[in-house]
Amino acid sequence: MSAESFNIVHIRENKLLARRELLVEAVHQNASTPTRQSVREWVAKQLGIDISNVFVRRIKTEFGRGRSLAEVHVYNDSKIARVIEPLYILARNLGEEGKKLLEEAKKRRNERREKKKRKKK
């Protein structure tokens, strides 16, 4: 059983990017830093939205305090998030699907490099 408790410290509305930017505090005395997945699940449950619209940008733990602060972006639509969020953030938050996106991007990058090399010759 996990002894974590979460609290939303700050909410900022970013209408230009169609998202809410949250600062979430996680208190986890005598336990490890909470996972991205657990933070995503808690935020989605609290706001009553789909977990696919929630992306954890960073979790910063204060040394020796048993407290972490997480930066979370909550989008109105997951399609907007896939355009705006960097690929590495998508990969960290989406698990297997994110790894596939990362592999596809690497493949495209390598194809462009090969094409550029052939063009130089």
Swiss-Prot record:
Similarity field: Belongs to the eukaryotic ribosomal protein eS24 family.
GO cellular component, one term: ribosome
Protein name in UniProt: Small ribosomal subunit protein eS24
Ribonucleoprotein keyword on record: yes
One example GO MF annotation: structural constituent of ribosome
InterPro entries in the record: eRP_eS24_sf, Ribosomal_eS24, Ribosomal_eS24_CS, Ribosomal_uL23/eL15/eS24_sf
Any one of the GO BP annotations: translation
Signal sequence, start to end: none
Domain of life: Archaea
Pfam families, per the entry: Ribosomal_S24e (PF01282)
Alphabetical list of PROSITE patterns matching this protein: RIBOSOMAL_S24E
Organism of provenance: Pyrobaculum aerophilum (strain ATCC 51768 / DSM 7523 / JCM 9630 / CIP 104966 / NBRC 100827 / IM2)
Keywords tagged on the record: Ribonucleoprotein, Ribosomal protein
